[in-house]
Amino acid sequence: SKPSMLFLQSGNWPTIGIELMLLSMLHKLQSTKPVQPRTTDAWLANSQIMVAGNGKWLIAAKGGNNAESHNHNDVGSFIITYNGKPALIDLGRDTYTSQTFSNRRYEMMNNRSKYHNVPVINGYEQKDGSEYKGIDVDHTYTDSASVMLVDIAKAYPKEAEVKSWVRRLTLNRKLNKISIVEYIVMD
């Protein structure tokens, strides 16, 4: 019988297989200097989060919905840094209090869309709940650019009278620039 079948039938699979593999590599692992990999682009599809950089610029942006764990009403928000320093920021989180986890959480400024870099449309902020979300979210990565598109219109109540609000965030690595373009269609 093959060794892989023995591991599978032993009841210790996959643990013992991983341990044996690591033990067989121990000498190589001990003599290898750890190096932090440099990530120029990351896309977390389930969370609809993009992080893209080129050594100078870094952009992080999110789609998602307004019912996520520790939610803020911030679909379409982003932050930008240049040479490791904030260039365009998002207010972010405040100190957690009992109000943070109560039905009054959206009275707190840092949880409201008004205090994030998303628009207030016709006087309306984004609403909380899973039905308030980014749609038609897309991410494209090439060696020269990273692009995220998110339509944030569904993050707002009907009263905002917005049909489509597509936010396009681009890091152009070749031209060393970031662009944010808004495509807006009102009802």
Region locations from a protein language model:
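Carbohydrate-active enzyme catalytic cores, enriched for enzymes
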Residues: 1-87, 141-143
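Catalytic core of carbohydrate-active enzymes
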Residues: 59-142
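Hydrophobic side chains in beta-strands
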Residues: 54, 63, 80-82, 121, ...
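Acidic, contiguous internal or C-terminal segments within carbohydrate-active enzymes
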Residues: 148-187
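Residue-level marker for the onset of beta-strands and adjacent loop->beta junctions
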Residues: 48, 76, 115, 146, ...
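Catalytic cores of secreted or luminal carbohydrate-active enzymes
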Residues: 11-32, 86, 111-150, 155-158
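Short, ordered beta-strand-loop transition motifs
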Residues: 43-46, 138-147, 170-175
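A generic beta-sheet turn/junction motif
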Residues: 54, 82, 91, 114, ...
